[in-house]
Amino acid sequence: YSKVATEAQKLDGYHSSTALSSYTKENVYGKLKAMLSAGKLRRYVAKGALIAYVNSTIMDLLEQSTDFTRKIEMTQIAEGGIGIETRITDIDGVTLIEVIDDERFYDKFDFTDGFVPVKKVAANESNHVAAETGSHKINVLIASPLTVKTVPKIASIYYFNPGQHTEGDGYLYQDRSLSDTFVFPNGKDNKIDSIYVDVDTTEYAGE
């Protein structure tokens, strides 16, 4: 997420900053529609080639949106009983994916030791400390699978029999993978126009 968000923040007209608290059930649908029509994103909407990653709070509000009516149907579930599905998972052909692991949903990270959001640092000239902008939680991240590709760099599988490792007495299976994400320009004018990010206004200040 952070790699695509960083690229979107470099583009005019393809990023915004909105306080999460300003989203309401009355305006959430309109805000999402405005994002999906930003710049040249309509081209990708028409092709059915956009995915929107949305945080849980906004998904909850969209479910309660006052901009449209909904029909809730009950369905039989395999274990018996009745289930209902109320989540909105598509707008005009754009798939909406709820990001449950919100600790990963920031616009930048410090990868020095694992991955942690960048903490806001205030300038302190007497101690020669430069100011640093903290990470922002992502509200909505939009991308096209036509131009955003995740490429594996390393993909290794290891299998150890009992006695061949020090992690216990059983068999040990290890799967190690490392990937990177690239955002490619379109094939018409060599510009990036298939991504968009909206972030919260609050900077990360540490736990």
At which residue positions do the language-model features occur?
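Structured, hydrophobic secondary-structure cores that serve as assembly/anchoring elements
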Residues: 25-75
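Sequence/fold signature of self-assembling virion shell proteins
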Residues: 1-30, 64-207
